């Protein structure tokens, strides 16, 4: 059902203007930039997209714009997760209407829901997605929901689930999931362990830093397919040097600043309460943008 979803998927950023409104022109440029750099697909409206500081209407606008720019060109996964099941269902219906290839949802958070309530939440979204496969999104560090291996096994075998985004540093668990579910589409979620995640059984990845250097991650995939571990390690190291800087700056605002210097995003701001990048990092980010543009050619 979801085998066509394998690959390298950029977790799309959401550009805003100086007034904190959605910057539609920059969003369109960013989608095209990702297509041009050879990304297999886009994961829209997730953590990287600052979904949880947007209104439902804004999230729907983002889905619509991305579909207009990319439908039929690359694979599109709509993250529709909300704490509210009804709002998640509304976004899932919109994703179906706009022509997305799949939906995804983080486990509902903040309140201490039971595991059966989590399952019911996913069943309801799957029903509203009307045939689109579900990508379960496991990110315990941000959601606060720490699923056991048995619970993950239950979620990924719910009717309608076709994939799992595993944003966890537990590579042993990644391998266990692959061993238990050989046909499940399995995404690595932490960019800094992308190569290791592939070796542990992931089919590809969904990541934020793919927005600025997606070709490097495609290079890792190619190298590992060819058995060239040395090249894969070298590329992962180069990616991680960038990630080291972004962790210092704040990942999302750092990425937007790099894309600003690449003339893709007009305003390098995240939505409040996120603040701007500390000015002391701007020279390094500008040099990084220049280096990546030169490398990409």
From Swiss-Prot:
Group of enzyme by EC: lyase
Pfam families, alphabetized: DHDPS
Superkingdom classification of source: Bacteria
UniProt EC number: 4.1.3.3
Catalytic function, reaction form: aceneuramate = aldehydo-N-acetyl-D-mannosamine + pyruvate
Residues annotated as binding aceneuramate: 47-48, 167, 189, 191-192, 208
SUPFAM superfamilies in the record: Aldolase (SSF51569)
Keywords: Carbohydrate metabolism, Cytoplasm, Lyase, Schiff base
Major localization listed first in the record, in broad terms: cytoplasm
Function: Catalyzes the reversible aldol cleavage of N-acetylneuraminic acid (sialic acid; Neu5Ac) to form pyruvate and N-acetylmannosamine (ManNAc) via a Schiff base intermediate.
HAMAP family listed in its UniProt record: N_acetylneuram_lyase
UniProt record similarity statement: Belongs to the DapA family. NanA subfamily.
Protein name stated in the entry: N-acetylneuraminate lyase
Name of the gene this protein is made from: nanA
């Amino acid at each position: 059902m979801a085998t066509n979803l394998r690959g390298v998927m950029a977790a799309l950023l959401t550009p805003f203007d100086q007034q904190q409104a959605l910057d539609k022109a920059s969003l369109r440029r960013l989608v095209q930039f990702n297509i041009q750099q050879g990304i297999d697909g886009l994961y829209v409206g997730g953590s990287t997209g600052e979904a949880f500081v947007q209104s439902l209407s804004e999230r729907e606008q983002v889905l619509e714009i991305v579909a207009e720019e990319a439908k039929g060109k690359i694979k599109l996964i709509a993250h529709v997760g909300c704490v509210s099941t009804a709002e998640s269902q509304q976004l899932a219906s919109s994703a179906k209407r706009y022509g997305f290839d799949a939906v995804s949802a983080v486990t509902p958070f903040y309140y201490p829901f039971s595991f059966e309530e989590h399952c019911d939440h996913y069943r309801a979204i799957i029903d509203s997605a009307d045939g689109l496969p579900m990508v379960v999104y496991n990110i315990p560090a941000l959601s606060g929901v720490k699923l056991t291996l048995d619970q993950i096994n239950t979620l990924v075998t719910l009717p309608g689930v076709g994939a799992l985004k595993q944003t966890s540093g537990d590579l042993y668990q990644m391998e266990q999931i692959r061993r238990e579910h050989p046909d499940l589409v399995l995404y690595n979620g932490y960019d800094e362990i992308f190569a290791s995640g592939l070796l542990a059984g992931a089919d590809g990845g969904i990541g934020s830093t793919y927005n600025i250097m997606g070709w490097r991650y495609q290079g890792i995939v190619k190298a590992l397919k060819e058995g060239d571990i040395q090249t894969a390690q070298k590329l992962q190291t180069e990616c991680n040097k960038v990630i080291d800087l972004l962790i210092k700056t704040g990942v999302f605002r750092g990425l937007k600043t790099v894309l600003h210097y690449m003339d893709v995003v007009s305003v390098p701001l995240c939505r409040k309460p996120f603040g701007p990048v500390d000015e002391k990092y701007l020279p390094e980010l500008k040099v990084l943008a220049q280096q990546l543009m030169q490398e990409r050619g």
